[in-house]
């Protein structure tokens, strides 16, 4: 078996990636989230496949087909709630994974980091088109509001919106193409994830100390396979608790009402994992400005490798930047809260302050604190 896994053309790739991979001996549980994201992706593809067998992407039957899955299909309710809450678990793991990358300076591996940003954007697109499929009130109006933002693009905006809609409003053509996108995108995510791993294994993994770990590597299996298994079991435990005890806690009550183009919900808002970006969008009174801020709220992650002027790797020995980092996390939580609130005083003002703070921390405060810490080292 030992000879086979080292010489077989296919098993050799698996062996170099998951068995004999030299890994830093000190990586903590924060490094588990990559494998957890892989697990989430597998759960989403499997549950999504079974849901697609019973779902119909037609405006007249979409809502009923989801109800049919929950009522009449064997364990359909479980598959549906695992898929819906699996998306939330996916984004929790994704946010922690990105947060860990920022804290421990993983962005210096720029190819891996940039592929990660593409993965983040693709996952957000997949989740957005997936949220439209049940064809409830929030699905319909969410699709209308978010796709309508593209009309802010000068000259081609309106044409682009009608092209995406497949008509003059969100209708049957929109739902059908969103279902097609939702089906194909997870496989594109899988391909990007493999490229992400390929680039990571070119350089080797970062570690909590931020120091070179070439002199202290251990094989990935059995040490980190067992560690990842523990993380996977904990993830499955949380997911099952969510799906079985609190299946609708992260959903929107409006989505239990079938889509009605003649009746607008009181507060249109996306799923919780988009609220931070939605708050940034709403905090700018200008439509085009809001759309640009929305896109930049994710693309700003690409600035981390460019703005990195620190002589140290990661934040473990950098107390000033550590404080700024945790302010940044708190600010993100404030934005998430604001995104779910109505557009009125004082929420609009808090949202504007939090949005400015979000960009200021990344572009101004972190580079300044890096410079201060570099000078402290020289003392």
Swiss-Prot record:
Heme b b566 binds at residues 97, 196. Keywords: Electron transport, Heme, Iron, Membrane, Metal-binding, Mitochondrion, Mitochondrion inner membrane, Respiratory chain, Transmembrane, Transmembrane helix, Transport, Ubiquinone. The chain crosses the membrane at residues 33-53, 77-98, 113-133, 178-198, 226-246, 288-308, 320-340, 347-367. A ubiquinone binds at residue 201. Binds 2 heme b groups non-covalently. It is a multi-pass membrane protein. GO terms for cellular component: mitochondrial inner membrane; respiratory chain complex III. Its cofactor is heme b. GO terms for biological process: mitochondrial electron transport, ubiquinol to cytochrome c. Heme b b562 binds at residues 83, 182. Belongs to the cytochrome b family. The cytochrome bc1 complex contains 11 subunits: 3 respiratory subunits (MT-CYB, CYC1 and UQCRFS1), 2 core proteins (UQCRC1 and UQCRC2) and 6 low-molecular weight proteins (UQCRH/QCR6, UQCRB/QCR7, UQCRQ/QCR8, UQCR10/QCR9, UQCR11/QCR10 and a cleavage product of UQCRFS1). This cytochrome bc1 complex then forms a dimer. Component of the ubiquinol-cytochrome c reductase complex (complex III or cytochrome b-c1 complex) that is part of the mitochondrial respiratory chain. The b-c1 complex mediates electron transfer from ubiquinol to cytochrome c. Contributes to the generation of a proton gradient across the mitochondrial membrane that is then used for ATP synthesis. Heme 1 (or BL or b562) is low-potential and absorbs at about 562 nm, and heme 2 (or BH or b566) is high-potential and absorbs at about 566 nm. This is Cytochrome b. It comes from Akodon spegazzinii.
């Amino acid at each position: 078996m030992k000879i086979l896994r080292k010489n077989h053309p296919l098993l050799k790739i698996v062996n170099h990636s998951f068995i004999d991979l030299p890994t830093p001996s000190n990586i903590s549980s924060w490094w588990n989230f990559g494998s957890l994201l892989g697990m989430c992706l597998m759960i989403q593809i499997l549950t999504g496949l079974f849901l697609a067998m019973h779902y119909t992407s037609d405006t007249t039957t979409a809502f009923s087909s989801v109800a049919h899955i929950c009522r009449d299909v064997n364990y359909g309710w479980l598959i549906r709630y695992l898929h819906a809450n699996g998306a939330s678990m996916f984004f929790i793991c994704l946010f922690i994974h990105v947060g860990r990358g920022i804290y421990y300076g993983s962005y210096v591996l720029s190819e891996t980091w940039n592929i990660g940003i593409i993965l983040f954007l693709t996952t957000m697109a997949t989740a957005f088109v997936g949220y439209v499929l049940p064809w409830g009130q929030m699905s319909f109006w969410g699709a209308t509001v978010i796709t309508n933002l593209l009309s802010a693009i000068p000259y081609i905006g309106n044409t682009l919106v009608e092209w995406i809609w497949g008509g003059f409003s969100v209708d049957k053509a929109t739902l059908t193409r969103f279902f097609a996108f939702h089906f194909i995108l997870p496989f594109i995510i899988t391909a990007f994830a493999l490229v992400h791993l390929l680039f990571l294994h070119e350089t080797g993994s970062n570690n909590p100390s931020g120091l070179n770990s070439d002199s202290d590597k251990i094989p990935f299996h059995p040490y980190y396979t067992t560690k990842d298994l523990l993380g996977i079991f904990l993830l499955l435990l949380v997911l099952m608790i969510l799906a079985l005890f609190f299946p609708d806690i992260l959903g929107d009550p409006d989505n239990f009402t079938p889509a009605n183009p003649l009746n607008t919900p009181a507060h249109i808002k996306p799923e919780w994992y988009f609220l931070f970006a939605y708050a940034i969008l709403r905090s700018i009174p200008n439509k085009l400005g809001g759309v640009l801020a929305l896109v930049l709220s994710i693309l700003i992650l690409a600035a981390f490798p460019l703005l990195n002027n620190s002589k140290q790797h990661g934040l473990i020995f950098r107390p000033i930047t550590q404080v700024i980092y945790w302010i940044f996390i708190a600010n993100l939580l404030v934005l998430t809260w604001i995104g779910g609130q109505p557009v009125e005083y004082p929420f609009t003002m808090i949202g504007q302050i939090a949005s400015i703070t979000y960009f200021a921390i990344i572009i101004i405060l972190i580079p300044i604190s890096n410079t201060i810490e570099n000078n402290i080292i020289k003392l």
